[in-house]
Swiss-Prot record:
PANTHER family: LEUCINE--TRNA LIGASE, MITOCHONDRIAL, LEUCYL-TRNA SYNTHETASE
One Gene Ontology term from the biological process aspect of the record: leucyl-tRNA aminoacylation
Organism lineage: Bacteria, Pseudomonadati, Pseudomonadota, Alphaproteobacteria, Rhodospirillales
Motif 'KMSKS' region, chain ranges: 625-629
Protein name, UniProt field: Leucine--tRNA ligase
Organism: Paramagnetospirillum magneticum (strain ATCC 700264 / AMB-1)
Intervals of motif 'HIGH' region: 49-59
CDD domains in the record: Anticodon_Ia_Leu_BEm, LeuRS_core
A Pfam cross-reference name: Anticodon_1
PROSITE patterns in the record: AA_TRNA_LIGASE_I
GO cellular component: cytosol
Amino acid sequence: MSRPDGISGDRYNVKETEARWQQAWEAKRCFEAEIAPGKPKYYVLEMFPYPSGRIHMGHVRNYTLGDVVARYKRAKGFNVLHPMGWDAFGLPAENAAIQNNVHPAKWTRENIAAMREQLKSMGLSYDWRREVATCEPEYYRHEQKMFLDFLKAGLVYRKESWVNWDPVENTVLANEQVIDGRGWRSGALVEKRLLSQWFLKITAYAQDLLDSLATLERWPERVRLMQENWIGRSEGARLMFDLDGRSDRLEIFTTRPDTLFGAKFVAIAANHPLAAELAAGNPALAEFVAECNRMGTSEAAIETAEKKGFDTGLRAVHPFDSTWTLPIYVANFVLMDYGSGAIFGCPAHDQRDLDFANKYGLGWTQVVEPASDGQAVLAAIAKGEAYTGDGVAVNSQFLDGLAVDEAKAEAIRRIEEMGRGERTINYRLRDWGVSRQRYWGCPIPVIHCEACGTVPVPAEQLPVVLPEDVSFDKPGNPLDHHPTWKHVDCPCCGKPARRETDTFDTFFESSWYFARYTSPDRTDVAFDRVAADYWMSVDQYIGGIEHAVLHLLYSRFFTRALKDCGYLNVKEPFAGLLTQGMICHETYKSEDGAWLFPTEVVPGADGKLVHAETGAPVTGGRSEKMSKSKKNVVDPAGIIDGYGADTARLFMLSDSPPERDLDWTEAGIDGAWRYVNRLWRMVATAELPPAGAPMPELSPEAAKIRRLLHKTIAQVGEDLERFHFNKAVARIREMTNGLGELPAGDSGAAWVLREGLEATARLIGPMMPHLAEEMWLALGGSGLLAEAAWPEADPALLVEDSVTVAVQVNGKLRATIELPKDVDAALAEQTALAQPQVISAMSGKPARKVVVVPNRIVNVVV
């Protein structure tokens, strides 16, 4: 027996080792994927990053998870596509240009180069040949062509619309980008503005997007529910209210036509055409409308604002009773882009309507009575709460006595019979406004001609490339200020015309990048059809849940549109989805309330936290998501430089399931580092038989550890299939603890130790790939471990040879014992009666009867 030859020295040189194996993988081109029709494919993808210049711990976790999956699937025999790229357009580059006097393109490309090296230092198994950057004309020329094809297909249109305007970023935000009335990036209070915008017709796919959620069985239920709620299908009626003293009508959508007899008012949006008409002759109303327009257009902004209304003096005629009129208010809580921009209010059965009615003294009428408690509505309203539950219609003429669903159906039938409306379906989902008033984005390929109108840029003139000679010394869009770029001849009539100066929302680029990876070298087409048909859909997508109704929904729509325009043959982009949790760290504040970096805090002599330089007391706060604003961040580069990529990867996998938040702790990273070194020492110091030596007779202890080894192989494979990475790590640790307990000087134990260390190297390969390669080399493994197959467990060793048997005294559990499977009943009885707990429970009395149920129970009757 001898020690392995592949390891020298008395400590693990992590920097040299990791760099060496990264070079070896690159030289061997281990991770370059090609179409292989006879091999099962597996496409694993993590959401690509914005190139800010430095990776953060969230990146480390996200990309580690994806890399474990990619390496494991390769070992299982799959043809794995695992690419990486850059979501490279966006406002931060423009902000950097303003602050640092550097061009966005230069800033972005330098950041990409820096982050590429950081990602490579993690040992990630990417096919770097397929790298894309969305800011390059070679990429966005294809999305300009897609836009023109969508335009031909009727999926694009332009209209004036009220938009969410971010006054800090000077651009339009989609509703999904407005959070609690503020811009999702700047945090500025969002305003309403009327602008001419380009829209993608996502609503054309609303029902299919909703129905197909049921097919996404490998998506988290939470994400599917979020998309279902965002699409927001509601069945109801479109009602036509006559306007008292006028010949026109007001259209109202409602999901509760059964409550019409409880109506007390009508409310219209501040940007409703009727509101604009009435405000033209009413200065007070005009001021109220202007106040409403200073709010954001999203539901979040409206829900958080105080509910206000303005009585226009106009009245609407009740559709079931021409003698009954309702006051019409302009209200700040009515959305113009939901339904028809007008509602009727039934205060007794809608909380918002009740609050509004109470504020303006409009009263209420109960029209639904709970079957179980006739006083429930009165009791609720007395507490300021509307009753929104089921029941039967009351005070509703021909609807009285009908259950709510029956009353809805009957109300709609009468409305249709009278010609005052119809049954309809409405969606909360709005068409996607993709126009952005900024420079660093993909130019929209359209020309505006006074003679010809809106003209698509001819395909042969694509791409429309951003000008490089721009300045950022004025607010707003530099393309608007450019002296020459926007001036162009009309491709139809040849007269002077103007380019569209808006650029695409950056979610446009991320809505199709995953398909571009299948053939990024094709310059003539966005996707090679053979490659796209082979690789798509993405088998496993990994990213944050914050993208549930932004990127993920847009990508589902975009893929459908591409399919309908002949680009792809799939309509769902991501077959499986894993949403990882956040990385959290304790927060720290100085005496004056300023946030402190973790590196600025140390334990004092008394164990309490103090400032590292001044010694001043520091207050430790709760663990929160790592963020620059609270300074509770840890630089991955420092961790990788000090501990190595494998240690960082192991920590990311060890302590929490991937979908949960992970608390970063120094103790945790130190523990991971100790385990890395422990594995290295186990191999470096092991006295092992030659590779391939026949198995000698094993002692019971060695046989027990070998059985644990093979169970671990089987269980770790199952854990990785289910993304239970923390469980896999725990099982490997338990198994290597067992290997460490094998007795020295025992040939059978040494043989099991070699088998165990070889299997350990292969099991940790997806998680700690550099250490795994080093162990594999030292143990005499053939070739690169990155190309080796996953270990297989011996089925015979997975069969339990012992069972846990419960021992009862007079039917009460007193002990459990380990017995050989199918043991003789006499031995089972003898072992049970010898247990101290059983002897105590028998209190010196003889056993009158002992019942043995094989492999399950021994029951002693006294």
